[in-house]
Amino acid sequence: MDELEELLGESPAIHTVREKLCQLLKHPPAGRRLPAVLLQGETGTGKGLVARLVHRMGPRKDGPFVAINCPAIPETLLEAELFGFERGAFTDARHAKPGLLQAAHRGTLFLDEVGLLPEAAQAKLLTAIEERVVRRLGSTRSEAVDVCFISATNTDLQAALRARRFRDDLYHRLAVITLYMPALRERGRDVLLLAQRFLARACADYGLPPKTLGEQAQARLLAHRWPGNWRCA
């Protein structure tokens, strides 16, 4: 699976991630859904990258990939974004609009930071998963949806379950397969491989001759704790 080479690294932690992805994607059923996947780990550990890899390598690769950052949308608008709305459902609803679940029909819906999903939206999402239907705001009609779900969280969902901030039944629907994305500080010398890749990319982008990391630079990279991990466009 050559595409998994995007998950650069040789540490045991990243090997475990690749092995689990291989098991999940080795024989994907054509046209069918993969089991729901929950990606856990700190911010900046590559959960979005893995979500896109699973979509591209899975049986829904020819369908849409629709991503939503759950806390980035105001709670008052989230249900309309996810489930859609009919004309006149609220003051500014001048035209009917399908929601993101319908936009992801026969493809993949990526729910980023799903642990921060409001309780009301959790209940409607559970219905969509279990019954494979959605009902737009202002509508009395349910419409079929066929979606593969991938979710991600950097919060402790077990604590949220104990505190009753997250529905237990929804958790089990979303976490059929769980995958932990390790932080950089858990990946040892992988940081050097990543740094060298980004350095090579920067040299190419700016028309500079290839460069390598010196011993002092390597030592400082390895000694750093990498709070927030690493993001690179």
Regions found by a protein language model. Give the residues of each.
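Short coil/loop residues immediately preceding or within conserved phosphate-binding loops
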Residues: 34, 96, 221
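Short gly/ser/thr-rich secondary-structure transition/capping motifs
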Residues: 88-95, 131-136, 159
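Nucleotide-binding/hydrolysis machinery
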Residues: 3-15, 19-23, 58-63, 138-148, ...
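AAA+/SF3 P-loop NTPase mechanochemical coupling elements
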Residues: 66, 93-106, 110, 118-124, ...
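Conserved post-Walker A coupling segment in P-loop NTPases
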Residues: 6, 20-92, 103-118, 183-188
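Conserved RecA-like P-loop NTPase ATPase core
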Residues: 17, 45, 68, 82, ...
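Interdomain coupling helix/linker and adjacent catalytic-core signature
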Residues: 16, 50-53, 97, 194-195
